[in-house]
Amino acid sequence: LPGARCAYDMTQTPASVEVAVGGTVTIKCQASQSISTYLSWYQQKPGQRPKLLIYRASTLASGVSSRFKGSGSGTEFTLTISGVECADAATYYCQQGWSSSNVENVFGGGTEVVVKG
C-alpha cells in the first residue's frame, strides 16, 4: 500500500567485546531483509553525539581513520577496526538507511568496545 512502512530489524553482534591496544575488532550487523548497501556505522562516546564512521556499507566518512573498514551488502555487514587505540573505546551502532520515505531508519542494538591498555 502507498505510504505503508516496512519493518526492518537490525541484529548486531556481539553486544560487548574486549580488545587489547593494537588488536582487531569485528562487529557484525544482520538485517532482516535486504537493504542493498544502505548501511551506516556510528561511534558514540558517553555524553557525545554519534559520529558517522561509514556510510553506504563501505564508504569512509570525511576525517575518519582508515583503520575503520566497512563491508557487506544485502543482509550481512561487518565493521572492522584494526590497530585498535584507546580512543576507539566507545559504543558502535549500525543503522539501515534506505533512501526511501516508506522505510524506517533502524539502528542495531549497539556494541560496546572495551580497550585494554
UniProtKB/Swiss-Prot annotation:
Disulfide bonds join C29-C86. GO terms for cellular component: immunoglobulin complex. Residues 7-29 are annotated as: Framework-1. Residues 1-6 form the signal peptide. SUPFAM superfamilies: Immunoglobulin (SSF48726). Residues 41-55 are annotated as: Framework-2. GO terms for biological process: adaptive immune response. Residues 95-106 are annotated as: Complementarity-determining-3. Residues 107-116 are annotated as: Framework-4. Keywords: Adaptive immunity, Disulfide bond, Hybridoma, Immunity, Immunoglobulin, Monoclonal antibody, Signal. SMART domains: IG (SM00409), IGv (SM00406). Residues 56-62 are annotated as: Complementarity-determining-2. GO terms for molecular function: antigen binding. The keyword Membrane does not apply. Residues 30-40 are annotated as: Complementarity-determining-1. InterPro entries: Ig-like_dom, Ig-like_dom_sf, Ig-like_fold, Ig_sub, Ig_V-set, IgV_Light_Chain. The keyword Kinase does not apply. PANTHER family: IMMUNOGLOBULIN LIGHT CHAIN (PTHR23267). This clone was derived from the rabbit-mouse hybridoma 12F2; the chain produced is a monoclonal antibody against streptococcal group C vaccine. This is Ig kappa chain V region 12F2. It comes from Oryctolagus cuniculus (Rabbit). The lineage of its organism: Eukaryota, Metazoa, Chordata, Craniata, Vertebrata.
